[in-house]
Amino acid sequence: MYVIDPIADMLTRIRNANNARHEVVDIPASKMKKAIAQILLEEGFIKEYEIIDDGKNGIIRIKLKYGPNKERAITGLKRISKPGRRVYAGKDELPKVLGGLGIAIISTSKGIMTDKKARKEGVGGEVLCYIW
């Protein structure tokens, strides 16, 4: 299956699995999706992820994180920069999501990172998505 916007597809799969309170979600793998999954892990939005070899690019299996009463760790995900309308932010214009409670994932010349790390590194880039 050909997907026009693979990152939006990844976010939608996570959102749907999260809303249905599934434990795991499988996503076709790519380097960018692996980097996003790593950021989600580091920021505490998911339990863990693993790469499963399927003979092609592989599959990322993400284990979603919930609280003791099935409260979601991820409240919302929003794609910002889309194939039809790219959104860029300079180092001084990097967004703060919900006043710092959420994260923005930025694709910079130094790799994919959170808005907080991009501010620290002093780089701007393409604003991929918001997660809170």
From Swiss-Prot:
A GO molecular-function annotation: structural constituent of ribosome
GO cellular component terms listed in the entry, alphabetical order: ribonucleoprotein complex; ribosome
Gene3D superfamilies: 3.30.1370.30, 3.30.1490.10
Entry's Gene Ontology BP terms: translation
UniProt keywords, alphabetically: Ribonucleoprotein, Ribosomal protein, RNA-binding, rRNA-binding
Pfam families, per the entry: Ribosomal_S8 (PF00410)
Function: One of the primary rRNA binding proteins, it binds directly to 16S rRNA central domain where it helps coordinate assembly of the platform of the 30S subunit.
NCBIfam families with a match to the protein in the record: PRK00136.1 (NF001109)
HAMAP family linked: Ribosomal_uS8_B
Assembly notes: Part of the 30S ribosomal subunit. Contacts proteins S5 and S12.
Family statement: Belongs to the universal ribosomal protein uS8 family.
Protein name: Small ribosomal subunit protein uS8
Lineage of origin: Bacteria, Bacillati, Bacillota, Bacillota incertae sedis, Caldicellulosiruptorales
Name of the coding gene: rpsH
